[in-house]
Amino acid sequence: MLTIESSLERRRFAIGDVHGCSRTLQKMVENVLQLKPDDTLYLLGDYIDRGPDSIGVLDYLLKLRESGFDIRPLRGNHEEMLLYAVADPTSRNMWYGNGGWGTLKQLGIDSPEAIPQRYIGFLNSLPYLIITEDYVFVHAGLDFQADNPLQDTPPQFMLWSRDRLVNPSNIGNRTLVTGHTVMPLFAIQGSLSTHHITLDNGCYDKGELSCGALVALNLDTRELLVQENIERQT
């Protein structure tokens, strides 16, 4: 059964893929957004892998939640790969090849089964989809070939799709907000006037032309907020 959240008188933000950039995320939340407990923050998945501090990202999200902040994190394909690697040893190589081995090294362990239950429980709790009155949040996309994309899109499509097709009339004229596919800042900015806003600028890939920043969106004003990658600054 789908749950549609009501928007109250509070600020609402969404943040794209973080990928292990814990210092950048913290600066975005505390200095750029200046997040307050009565704000709502949606996160689009892919908190782990590729960047230098995946566990720091998870710890920070858990700390925000435990401190009473209203955060609504989604599941990304990297979280799903980790969970599959824990449940099925034959799935490990796929995760390892997408940054998972580096995440294990950050934990100081060499097997997915040794990942602390604190993190496994958190990742298992993450939904694939969040629907509000005016937005639909999903990591990668929805299947607009389906009769009802909100009901009929398979989870793997939500996590892995790179299909740019969007038909807003099939999702209640809401705007779809996704991460997953790295886009240059000018393309992200251009998406703000459409029914499909993309927020992945490849935060982990510092130095890439027009990429390498963490991107957030004020959902009420459609203002784009950008924090450059600061992971390697001393």
Labelled PLM ranges:
Residues 1-8, 33-34, 64-66, 128-131, ...:
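A short acidic-Thr-Gly-centered motif at the start of a beta-strand
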Residues 19-23, 49-52, 79-83, 144-145, ...:
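Active-site environment of divalent metal-dependent phosphoester hydrolases
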Residues 50-133, 158-166:
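Active-site neighborhood of divalent metal-dependent phosphoester bond hydrolases
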Residues 17, 46, 61, 76-77, ...:
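Divalent metal-coordination and catalytic microenvironments
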Residues 12-19, 135-141, 197-199:
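Active-site-proximal beta-strand elements of phosphoester/diester hydrolases
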Residues 1-59:
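N-terminal active-site segment of His-dependent metallophosphoesterases
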Residues 115-186:
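His/acidic metal-ligating clusters that form di-metal
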Residues 154-228:
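Conserved beta-sheet core of the metallophosphoesterase superfamily
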